[in-house]
A protein has these predicted regions:
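Bacterial N-terminal signal peptides
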Residues: 2-13
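Short, well-ordered surface patches within globular domains
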Residues: 20-88, 137-143
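A well-ordered secondary-structure block
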Residues: 84-162
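A short, solvent-exposed beta-strand micro-motif common in secreted/extracellular proteins
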Residues: 204-217
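Extracellular beta-sheet/turn segments enriched in Thr/Pro/Gly and aliphatic residues
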Residues: 217-245
Length: 245
């Protein structure tokens, strides 16, 4: 089932006083996006996460939304009346997971390229919800864009994380026994009748916990893509085994 995590916004402002004395110019917004990507991956590596890779369709969704906020000076995850999931889908990205960070920054003295990239990245990193998105272990793709309002000079940044639907985990739970069984998958309970099979598709790592009839302790496993777990009765006892798919 596709997952859309809770989306959090960050608004950061720099007062003229704190900007005094710094070198300013017109930031290269394409370079800012590249630097934010590099710094995001550095932070992920520092926390033991795999780096994410730029995805053209996520980049397109980020550019479109950043440009909209810059044109309208409307700010928020649904500023255009749509969700991040709807925007990435419109660009042809079929997602299993999609997460979004946004930021709004302004300084009357402007920003340099390096400074703007640093403020965007650190602003997200210092916010628990945004940092959680940046460190999500199961996203693989990223899209980043920054746009500036011609009216107010405000910069709007969008960072999208995604995992394609094609990378979902698919596995089966089979009950070859003559009795119904109960099991939990990531905390959700299921009942499986005798001699029946159920297929599951998950976007995140799954934990399967099976309660076997007559056994006091449940059995927990982490299914991989293509796995088949089968409950069978051997003599008077029930057992769970990983069967050939």
């Amino acid at each position: 089932m596709p997952i859309l995590a809770t989306l959090l916004a960050l608004a950061a402002a720099v007062s003229p006083a704190t900007a005094q004395g710094r070198a300013r110019g017109s930031p290269d917004l394409g370079e800012v996006a590249r630097l934010v990507l590099d710094r995001t991956n550095d932070l992920r590596r520092g926390e033991g996460r795999e780096p994410v890779e730029s995805a053209s369709r996520l980049d397109a969704a980020a550019r479109s939304f950043a440009a909209y906020m810059a044109r309208s000076d409307r700010y928020g995850h649904e500023a255009d009346g749509r969700t991040a999931a709807q925007r990435v889908k419109e660009q042809g990205y079929t997602y299993c997971i999609v997460l979004e960070n946004i930021a709004s920054l302004y300084s009357s003295s402007g920003f340099g390229t390096q400074e703007l990239a640093s403020k965007v990245t650190q602003g997200w990193w210092q916010s628990e919800g945004h940092r959680r998105n940046m460190l999500d272990a199961e996203v693989t793709d990223i899209g980043i864009a920054i746009a500036q309002s011609g009216k107010t000079g405000t910069y709007y940044a969008v960072q999208l994380f995604g995992r394609p639907y094609r990378t979902r985990i698919e596995f089966r739970v089979a009950n070859a026994s003559p009795a119904p069984i109960e099991y939990d998958l990531n905390g959700k309970g299921y009942s499986l009748p005798a001699h029946s099979t159920r297929m599951h598709q998950e976007c995140r790592a799954a934990r399967l916990t099976v309660r076997l009839p007559g056994e006091r302790q449940p059995i927990s496993v982490k299914p991989a893509d293509g796995d088949r777990y089968e409950v069978e009765r051997v003599g008077s006892r029930f057992q769970l085994r990983r069967a050939a798919s």
